[in-house]
């Protein structure tokens, strides 16, 4: 079996496992506690999973792509830092994040395979293992750039519907599938009409709100309307904000051999 077919097979199995979990979880919970509030109908969780998958495909293409991202970090409304990154992504499992500005950090790269993440630095002989939750810059965690697969990393349930900025929105609670993902829990607002992502709140394992995100300025990129501006606001320190601008995005054929430590070592030379 070719590497591409193998990856496709793994992704298909993962989706089926998630769908099965979404269908079976309410009945399992009810069986554990006969006195508990009756579980949601199975279709509710299946619907939630479908909504998150559609929102994922709006944020980023399902196929291989390249995007250029500018990150401005602000404190009390004043910009104190700006960085730029090039992100190369193949499906939901393989990503390279290259630092392009400032010049002093050029040559640094993050490599994600599945949920395994390494950083490569010209001054260090061996790659260093990182967590998706570690801070990359400002309010941006490594996983915010390297991992965009909410449908694969979280178990979603619908917890309500409300109006947000004049739009009818579905409100979802996303629970991490394990501790290896970027956030323990996410509260997610998705437009009911077209599944556009609107807002997210990201929580720590303790339940503490870490930061909020707003998806803004939808424009035609890589074949469909996508949010080109993401505003991340620190919930613990008022006025600390990071603004991500997706300057370009295009579909690009990216062979799997690119997403290896050996390939990135060659880029450093």
What are these regions (language model features)?
Residues 29-36:
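Boundary at the C-terminal end of the N-terminal hydrophobic targeting segment
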